[in-house]
From Swiss-Prot:
This is 6,7-dimethyl-8-ribityllumazine synthase. It comes from the Bacteria. (2S)-2-hydroxy-3-oxobutyl phosphate binds at residues 86-87, 127. Its EC number is 2.5.1.78. One of its GO terms (cellular component) is riboflavin synthase complex. One of its GO terms (molecular function) is 6,7-dimethyl-8-ribityllumazine synthase activity. Keywords: Riboflavin biosynthesis, Transferase. The active site is at residue 89. Pathway: Cofactor biosynthesis; riboflavin biosynthesis; riboflavin from 2-hydroxy-3-oxobutyl phosphate and 5-amino-6-(D-ribitylamino)uracil: step 1/2. Catalyzes the formation of 6,7-dimethyl-8-ribityllumazine by condensation of 5-amino-6-(D-ribitylamino)uracil with 3,4-dihydroxy-2-butanone 4-phosphate. This is the penultimate step in the biosynthesis of riboflavin. The gene is ribH. GO terms for biological process: riboflavin biosynthetic process. It holds the Pfam family DMRL_synthase.
Amino acid sequence: MIQELKADLNGKGQKHCVIVSRFNEFITENLLKGALESFRMHGVREEDVTVVRVPGAYEMPVVVAKVAASKKYNSIVCLGAVIRGATAHFDFVAGESAKIGSIGVQHSIPVVFGVLTTDTIEQAIERAGTKAGNKGAEAAATAVEMVNLLSLL
C-alpha cells in the first residue's frame, strides 16, 4: 500500500520569521498584514512571529542565510514586490532574490518566496489583497504546512 504524507495547517508551537522589503512599501505592508493574519488564523501566536525589515528584495538572501543559520525559527517567509520598469533592474533583482530557496535547502528550513514579480503596479496591488487574493497570506499558510510536512519526514 502506498503511504501518503499530508500535512495540516495547524501552526501551534511554530516559530516563524518574516523578512519584508521596505521598497514598494505600499504593497509589502499589505502582504505583511495578510501574512500575520494568516499565521494567527492557523494558530501561530503573535509572539512566535518575528518581522525583519530589509531595504529591498536584493538584500533578502544574506538576511535569510543569517536567520536560517540561527536555528531559531521553523520557517522563513520572504515578502516583497519587484515591479518591472524600463530597465534591466527588474530582471537582476528578481533573479537575485529568487536564490533564497537554495538557502532553505542548505539549512533544511522552509523558505517561502512571497516576493511578487509583476509587470505593473496594478498586478502587484491585485496580488496584495484585492482581486487575486493576498500572496502574503498564502505564503504564511505555505510556511505552516511545510513545517508540518517536514516534521512528518
